[in-house]
A protein has these predicted regions:
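Alpha-helical transmembrane segments and immediately membrane-proximal extracytoplasmic
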Residues: 2-441, 449-566
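Classical protein tyrosine phosphatase
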Residues: 446
Length: 568
């Protein structure tokens, strides 16, 4: 029987590599969105900055691996054979679930997926054990960390409301103060904005960067004999004040003397920070389970006991993750970032929803999106009636969109939004995640970054009268997908754990089935990409002739009428 668990371990290692690929493909949107959307940095520069952030974040993520070992279930209640079944069920489910979201181009939370997969598989195994012992359903609480699921669900709701609201408010104020003609403002204006943004991002990088390192809990005489983590958390006000002054002076020097674009620096630093946070936090979602399985296997083989007699209390102890594994994971993640086409598909979804210009909308409007748009429109009209005309005219002038987003320029050269919105996206996301880290709140980086981007899009008037119902419908679809992730992850992992428990042969069947689905999704995705390229080339070829222009204009008019019918 020892061979079956060795084979399971080998399978888990292979699944870990695949999970890294599908996981990075989905989570890349969190840190690439702002840089790619603003188009102020070259694609190569963006990828290099993000790659460095990911690699450093991976090395710093050792402390986060405890989540897969004891964060969701109580390992001492399970035997080695049961733990291995739970881990197999989790990894198979995770790959299929994330690949599905990648294929349809929808962002989701890898944290929520892994948490609810662990929860579903461990609940299923607990119920099997309870049934065999003739226990009661209430005994499940002895096996499961029930408070964790509640925290995650509350985290989803909190992320959606808070991130969206704060993003919208900060963007509205930023646009009101800076307008779209921010380049004509005095140097000190850009310096103050740069100082605030870089301070937020620096604190964010420090909070997220040191959290998983071995230095986080070490004390140093230089900072009064306290740990770095405690120093950062207990001296927030002083750190922010001093850093803001320093960063504002540096920003002024960059603008005035070195003629640097401070917004490029903000976007580069923000991209690095979010990439570092993603790798540091989310690496556990991809390799935490296989590493826990490997450590369980080592402890079991050393014990000399039968698999169904060896309790897994060993997982409750803290065991450091070998750095070589973290480095290897970092290499896989960086390679995936550079070569994954599905990552670009997920990024496109978020960029389309936040685009300042007119695009071909992907999502169809529904009664809920129409209702929300009407409510927002009526509220805006009421606000306009209350305010004096002079104030309204001043606001309109500040929010007047430049030709960059409206004139007919090549689609590939047109930015989705400007550097002010990109900077606000990164700054607000960094602040919210830093606060969540400080107070140990279970906020997902995916939820925060996505909802901040949607909030800034709303207040920046990217959702016009003709596109609002489409964009709101898209946001609602993504949010529904988040809740669907939790439900599907819990149910599927529990079902797979039950099937594997019936017979270990089901592992081979399930892995074969998973491979078939992955190949099918890959082929399907490739066909969609190819068809898109062919269709685009045909439109360009037609537009070069007079008749082609007439046909294209007719299509646009038909689309406009159809869109008007859907809106009203």
């Amino acid at each position: 029987m020892e061979n079956i668990y060795l084979l399971m371990l080998v399978a888990l290692v292979a699944l870990a590599v695949a999970d890294l690929v599908v996981g990075v493909s989905n989570d890349a949107v969190n840190f690439l969105n702002s840089a790619l959307g603003s188009k102020v940095l070259s694609f190569r520069t963006i990828m290099i900055v993000a790659s460095i952030g990911i690699f450093i974040g991976c090395v710093f993520s050792s402390g986060m691996m405890e989540v897969a070992r004891k964060g969701i279930f109580n390992p001492g209640e399970f035997m080695f054979n049961e733990i291995m079944i739970i881990f197999m069920a989790v990894m198979i489910t995770d790959i299929l679930l994330l690949d599905f979201f990648n294929t349809v181009g929808m962002p989701t939370s890898t944290t929520v997926s892994i948490v609810f997969e662990l929860l579903g598989a461990s609940v299923a195994m607990a119920l099997i054990k309870i049934g065999m012992d003739n226990g009661s359903f209430s005994d499940v609480v002895n096996y499961i960390n029930t408070s964790k699921a509640t925290q995650i669900i509350l985290g989803i709701l909190l992320s959606v409301v808070v991130a969206f609201s704060i993003g919208a408010i900060v963007q509205w104020i930023s646009r009101l103060l800076l307008s779209y003609n921010f380049e004509t403002k005095p140097s000190w204006v850009g310096a103050v904005f740069g100082g605030i943004a870089l301070t937020a991002l620096t604190y964010f990088i420090l909070m997220k960067g040191i959290k998983g390192t071995s230095y986080a809990k070490e004390s140093f005489d230089l900072i009064g004999g306290v740990t770095i983590k405690d120093f950062l958390e207990n001296n927030v006000f002083q750190i922010v004040i001093y850093t803001s002054a320093l960063m504002s002076l540096l920003s002024y020097a960059f603008i005035q003397f070195f003629k640097f674009d401070i917004y490029k620096i903000i976007i580069a630093v923000g991209t690095f920070g979010l990439a570092l946070a993603f790798a540091g936090n989310d690496l556990v979602n991809f390799i935490g389970v296989p590493i826990a399985a490997w450590q369980s296997y080592e402890a079991w083989t050393a014990s000399g006991l039968a698999a169904n007699e060896f309790g897994m209390g060993v997982l409750a102890t803290k065991v450091p993750t070998p750095n070589i594994l973290l480095v290897c994971a970092g290499v896989v993640m960086v390679l995936t970032l550079w070569f994954s086409k599905k990552a670009k598909r997920v990024v496109k979804t978020e960029l389309d929803l936040s685009n300042q210009g007119n695009i071909e909308e992907r999502f169809e409007p529904n009664f809920l999106s129409r209702g929300l748009v009407r409510l927002a429109t009526n509220s805006s009209n009421l606000f306009s009636k209350i305010m004096p005309d002079s104030v309204n005219n001043k606001i309109e002038e500040r929010f007047r969109v430049p030709e960059t987003f409206t004139k007919a320029i090549a689609k590939e050269d047109r930015p989705s939004f400007d550097v002010i919105r990109a900077s606000v996206n990164l700054m607000v996301a960094g602040i919210l995640i830093s606060i969540a880290t400080s107070y140990k709140l279970p906020l997902s980086t995916t939820y925060v970054t996505f909802m901040v981007a949607m909030g800034t899009s709303l207040s920046d008037r990217a959702w016009g009268s003709d596109s609002a119902v489409y964009r709101v419908a898209g946001v609602l679809n993504v949010i529904a997908g988040w809740f669907g992730t939790a439900l599907i992850a819990f149910t599927a992992a529990g079902t797979i754990a039950y099937l594997i428990n019936i017979s270990e042969l089901m592992i081979a069947v399930l892995i074969f089935f998973a491979i078939l689905l992955l190949v099918r999704n890959y082929i399907k995705g490739k066909k969609v990409t190819t068809n898109g390229v062919i269709e685009e080339s045909l439109v360009i070829a037609e537009s070069s002739s007079l008749q082609g222009v007439i046909h294209e204009s007719a299509k646009n008019i038909a689309k406009l009428i159809k869109r008007g019918n859907k809106i009203y």
